[in-house]
């Protein structure tokens, strides 16, 4: 079941919230936060809008928010300002007594939806027949709980863009090959950084149920699921060439969800956290073109007026699904709690959560 199907089963915000002024909504969110105190915890991903992130009790990338969720034993309600797979991860890592809420069920992730459990279960026996028991599955945290559970049960782990290199290196100590899903670009960029040549990487197409590779399949070390981030695929080599031509003294830093060609042409690449820290530590007057989500790029620009910062793609839009979480939905979810009503609760079935926990724990133990 994908996010679009799930959202049909959940509550819809009353239209009255859309007619409120920003000032009124901010005042009411602050009031609910005061009233609920430590019973409420709001984690917010870096890609969230400023109107939402201002109320976050903790901000971070996927790894940081997973760690924060795992450590929080106090909050009764966790209102997650991110996307569906992040809220699922929070539900898995927190106690049964803690309630995880996603303010808008439309906040999904197109990348996570590119790997459905039925597709993975069809692919696995074919790959086993080709390679035997030589494959360890790894999944980017940008995946459904069901995918995480599959990976956990088969001895694998989750990864984030912050620790992908460490986790892929670990995986190669366990098995001869890795099966990386759902983001082919992060998998390819990480394996290449670790010395695996492109000639030893293949792509699994879940639509045609085939392995895309020319040559002797026994040479394959990395099997990449044919998935991608719809935001980061919009950065191209042409954008880099334009910056090199018009601003030759500007450094280019991109997220590893970008294509291999873009990452190779950039000056630097790294996780959201890495990008934030790199810009923060750069000298005043330095010039940067950033290849990642637009809400974050705009926030970095505001935080560093002493530096010249632009988006690598000047026509970039924010992540549309992240943008579903807005001030009206946050206020509605919070005020519903004061009324004794829980809306849009995220609950991962116990059997799925147990398998996913195995994958997450293997990652967190090495984070």
UniProtKB/Swiss-Prot annotation:
One of its GO terms (cellular component) is cytosol. It catalyses: iminosuccinate + dihydroxyacetone phosphate = quinolinate + phosphate + 2 H2O + H(+). Coiled coil: none annotated. Its cofactor is [4Fe-4S] cluster. InterPro entries: NadA, NadA_sf, Quinolinate_synth_A_type3. Keywords: 4Fe-4S, Cytoplasm, Iron, Iron-sulfur, Metal-binding, Pyridine nucleotide biosynthesis, Transferase. The keyword Metal-binding applies. Binds 1 [4Fe-4S] cluster per subunit. Pathway: Cofactor biosynthesis; NAD(+) biosynthesis; quinolinate from iminoaspartate: step 1/1. It is found in: Cytoplasm. Its EC number is 2.5.1.72. The keyword Iron applies. One of its GO terms (biological process) is 'de novo' NAD biosynthetic process from L-aspartate. Its main location: cytoplasm. [4Fe-4S] cluster binds at residues 109, 229, 319. SUPFAM superfamilies: NadA-like. Iminosuccinate binds at residues 45, 62, 140-142, 161, 255-257, 272. GO terms for molecular function: 4 iron, 4 sulfur cluster binding; metal ion binding; quinolinate synthetase A activity. Belongs to the quinolinate synthase family. Type 3 subfamily. Catalyzes the condensation of iminoaspartate with dihydroxyacetone phosphate to form quinolinate. HAMAP family: NadA_type3. This is Quinolinate synthase. It comes from Anoxybacillus flavithermus (strain DSM 21510 / WK1).
């Amino acid at each position: 079941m994908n996010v679009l199907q799930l959202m049909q089963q959940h509550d819809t915000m009353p239209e009255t919230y859309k007619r409120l002024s920003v000032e009124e909504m901010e005042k009411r969110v602050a009031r609910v936060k005061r009233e609920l105190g430590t019973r409420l915890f709001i984690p917010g991903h870096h890609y969230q809008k400023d109107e939402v992130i201002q109320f976050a009790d903790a901000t971070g990338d996927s790894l940081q928010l997973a760690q924060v969720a795992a450590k929080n034993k106090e909050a009764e309600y966790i209102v997650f300002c991110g996307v569906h797979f992040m809220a699922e991860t929070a539900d898995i890592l927190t106690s049964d007594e803690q309630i995880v809420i996603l303010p808008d069920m439309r906040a999904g992730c197109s990348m996570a939806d590119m790997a459905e459990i039925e597709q993975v279960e069809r692919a696995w026996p074919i790959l086993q027949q080709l390679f035997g028991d030589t494959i360890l599955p790894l999944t980017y945290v940008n995946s459904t709980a069901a995918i995480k559970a599959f990976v956990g049960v088969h001895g694998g782990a989750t990864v984030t863009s912050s620790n992908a290199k460490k986790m892929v290196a670990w995986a190669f100590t366990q098995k001869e090959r890795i099966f990386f899903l759902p983001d082919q670009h992060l998998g390819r960029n990480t394996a290449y950084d670790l010395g695996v040549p492109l000639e030893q990487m293949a792509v699994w197409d879940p639509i045609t149920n085939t392995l895309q590779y020319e040559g002797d399949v026994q040479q394959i070390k990395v099997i990449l699921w044919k998935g991608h981030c719809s935001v980061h695929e919009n950065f191209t080599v042409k954008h880099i060439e334009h910056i090199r031509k018009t601003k030759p003294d500007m450094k280019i830093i991109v997220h590893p969800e970008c294509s291999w060609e873009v990452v190779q042409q950039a000056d630097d690449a790294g996780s959201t956290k890495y990008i934030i820290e790199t810009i923060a530590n750069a000298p005043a007057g330095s010039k940067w073109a950033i290849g990642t989500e637009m809400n974050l790029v705009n926030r970095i620009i505001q935080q560093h007026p002493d530096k010249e910062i632009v988006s690598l793609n000047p026509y970039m839009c924010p992540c549309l699904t992240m943008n579903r979480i807005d001030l009206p939905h946050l206020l509605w979810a919070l005020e519903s709690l004061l009324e004794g009503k829980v809306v849009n609760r995220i609950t991962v079935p116990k059997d799925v959560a147990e398998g996913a926990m195995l994958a997450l724990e293997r990652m967190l133990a090495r984070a």
